[in-house]
Swiss-Prot record:
Residues 1-69 are annotated as: Disordered. This is Sperm protamine P1. InterPro entries: Protamine_P1 (IPR000221). Keywords: Chromosome, Developmental protein, Differentiation, DNA condensation, DNA-binding, Nucleosome core, Nucleus, Spermatogenesis. Belongs to the protamine P1 family. The keyword Cytoplasm does not apply. It is found in: Nucleus; Chromosome. Its main location: nucleus. GO terms for cellular component: nucleosome; nucleus. Testis.
Amino acid sequence: MARYRHSRSRSRSRYRRRRRRRRSRYRGRRRRYRRSRRRRRRGRRRGNCLGRRGYRRRRYSRRRRRRYY
């Protein structure tokens, strides 16, 4: 019983530490992503739109063909 209790307490502490780290990392990524997105939109607006349109058209055509056949 002593061994079981020890392993149980160990796993609990590990789980708590992982949870806290994940939260802090997610918050940092969110802020950085928003800042980078705003900067990119101002500079490369035309190129982005053209690239996205072509990519979307190709994707949808492939999906429709698969469904019909």
